[in-house]
A protein has these predicted regions:
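Positively charged, amphipathic and often flexible ligand-engagement surfaces
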Residues: 50-361
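Cationic, low-complexity basic patches in intrinsically disordered or flexible, solvent-exposed regions
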Residues: 3-4, 8-16, 20, 49
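Helicase P-loop NTPase motor core of nucleic-acid translocases
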Residues: 43-45
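Enrichment for repetitive, rod-forming helical segments
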Residues: 9-10, 19, 35, 350, ...
């Protein structure tokens, strides 16, 4: 397949305050942002010893993930880069390819994600697709054990669903030629139905079957019905808990209910004979999965556990040593802030790690 002509251009950002006409505003904004980050990190550290209501802290972090001033400071500063480096494999294609090769050497598969969402023009969508075409070429040329994960809003879904479909279809076609796979990421609940419909349309082409899949979030009430539909169409699924802020009318508000639904959905997926991914760092969910496949006689190579880059590396290695397949989701790029904040929101250990390191020189 011919590589997209759209070249990947790394965004070269400057520290806030470099534009003379905005010096005063930027200085105030920068100082306020630093104070805000320091305050959040302090709250996280204190909460480790004197627990606060976790849903409140989670909601705060998700709200901050949408704060433009914090995002601008974080993505353009050395401090932000240092904070994100645990979970984000650099900003360039070459950096993420090196990270993927390193993970592969440990016997672990990878899924590569060029960070970004909600593009504002068809040109931005084409540029984002161009990055993925470069990744697919490199995966084939370097014989990496890797696939790619793509958000439809990055392909132009907000602008024109037909544009997003065209961009995604070109990537799946390329993945077929490269003998790999495209995972369509799930975003907020506003996009759930459109995402499932588009994956169904992509999978309906005979040549694409087995080369495109989707993500289902266990915290949504609708997920069992969605899984039943997708299984009937033979579509591969990544099951995760979900990391976006959703109302109680759409999603289970309590972790215990999310966990119960996760186990229920896992038990629906794994006997289907389709290769699925169980995406969790929760040892209780992992142990429930291990017990279930043992009871049902499901071989360890009939599914995979999936985890995030930089999270529970010890557990990744343990699962591989025990004979299970593991895939690590590796994000990269300059637009890392929303992803990073959602990772802090969903897992206390991530928050504590970052908060402690924020105050270290």
């Amino acid at each position: 397949m011919q590589q997209s002509s759209v070249e990947f251009t790394e965004y070269q950002s400057n520290e806030l305050g470099n534009e003379p006409e905005n010096d005063l505003w930027n200085l105030r904004d920068l100082n306020a942002t630093r104070i805000c980050i320091s305050l959040v990190c302090s709250i996280i550290i204190v909460s480790e010893h004197c627990p606060v209501h976790m849903p409140i802290l989670r909601s705060l972090l998700i709200a901050l993930s949408r704060n433009s001033s914090l995002r601008r400071f974080a993505e353009s500063s050395t401090l932000g880069g240092r904070m994100s480096s645990r979970f984000v494999a650099g900003t360039s294609v070459e950096e993420v390819l090196k990270a993927a090769a390193s993970v592969n050497r440990q016997g672990i598969s990878t899924s590569l994600d060029s960070l970004g969402e909600n593009v504002h023009s068809p040109q931005e969508a084409q540029q984002a697709a161009g990055v993925y075409h470069r990744l697919l070429d490199a995966i084939q040329q370097r014989q990496l054990d890797a696939n790619v994960s793509v958000k439809l809003t990055q392909m132009g879904m907000d602008l024109d669903p037909e544009l997003a479909y065209a961009m995604a279809a070109s990537l799946v076609e390329h993945a077929v030629a490269a003998n790999t796979f495209v995972r369509i990421d799930m975003e907020g609940s506003d996009y759930t139905q459109a995402t499932i419909d588009m994956v169904s349309k992509l999978n309906a082409l005979n040549a694409n079957r087995g080369h495109v899949g989707v993500v289902i979030q266990a915290y949504l009430y609708r997920s069992k019905a969605d899984i039943d539909r997708l299984l009937a169409e033979g579509i591969r699924i990544r099951l995760c808990k979900g990391a976006y802020q959703e109302p109680a009318s759409l999603a289970f508000p309590e972790k215990a209910d999310v966990d119960r639904n996760f186990v229920r959905l896992m038990q629906t997926l794994l006997p289907s004979g389709i290769y699925h991914g169980i995406a969790t760092h929760d040892e209780k969910m992992i142990e429930a999965t291990r017990r279930f496949v043992k009871e049902r006689g499901i071989a360890p190579d009939q599914f995979e556990f999936q985890m995030l880059y930089g999270v529970r590396r010890d557990l990744q290695k343990t699962l591989v040593a025990d004979g299970y397949r593991v895939r690590v989701y590796i994000p990269f790029g300059t637009e890392w802030y929303p992803y990073f904040m959602r990772r802090l929101a969903e897992r206390p250990a991530n928050r504590i790690f970052i908060a402690r390191n924020f105050f270290r020189q």
